Amino acid sequence: TMTDKATGDTLYRMSFCTLFQEWQATEEATRVRKSFENVFLVPMPAAPAEITVQLYDFHENVAASLKHPVDPKDILIRPVDGKPQTRMLLNSGDSKEKIDIAILAEGYTESEMDIFFKDAESTVENLLRHEPFKSMSDRFNIVAVASPSQDSGVSVPREGLWKKTAVDSHFDTFYSDRYLTTLHLFKMHDALAGIPYEHIIILANTDTYGGGGIYNSY
């Protein structure tokens, strides 16, 4: 929740889930301590504001809370300038009025970008076959973002296969064979700098069934 520092008025509010919260339910979490990257997308306030982040447990009780002040005039807020190569796959209008989805390339080398854009087009076609996207397609903008990887494909730890890719995704998350995720959210959002987006689809260059989704994350 973002509130105006002077008046206390609520400026912005969103709910979220994280891979960290899922990890908390694993057996590993009973034995070791870990930290996870996370990113919150919030509008830049026009005046000093305060952001409150509350983490709830499985019983919907507040388990942790933190507050962070934001001053738009703070000289240490560094802008991230980005001009990624993009291709608009569905353009329904002004991003201020639409839900913007970014499809991010993962495991596609520079020479495979044409393949990525074709795969992204196929992804959109399949997405729009299903509700609510089918009947509400005019409410969405979808853009494909070329984020080239050094290696082709994605990492499979159980096979000893580690690739150098755009957002360092890998299978075997939480030791589940099919679970393909990334822990590197800073890289993911930096790759999208300069374009409007609310939701992210990481399109991995693999034929292996798998993946996952985290509410309001990716």
Question: What do the PLM-derived regions correspond to, one by one?
Answer:
Residues 124, 217-218:
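Active-site recognition of the HExxH zinc-binding catalytic motif
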Residues 74-134, 144-154, 160, 186-195, ...:
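Fold-level signature of zinc-dependent metallopeptidase catalytic domains
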Residues 31-35, 44-48, 94:
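Surface-exposed coil/turn segments at beta-strand junctions on protein surfaces, enriched
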Residues 1-39:
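N-terminal prosegments of processed precursors
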Residues 139-216:
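Active-site-proximal segments of metallohydrolase catalytic domains
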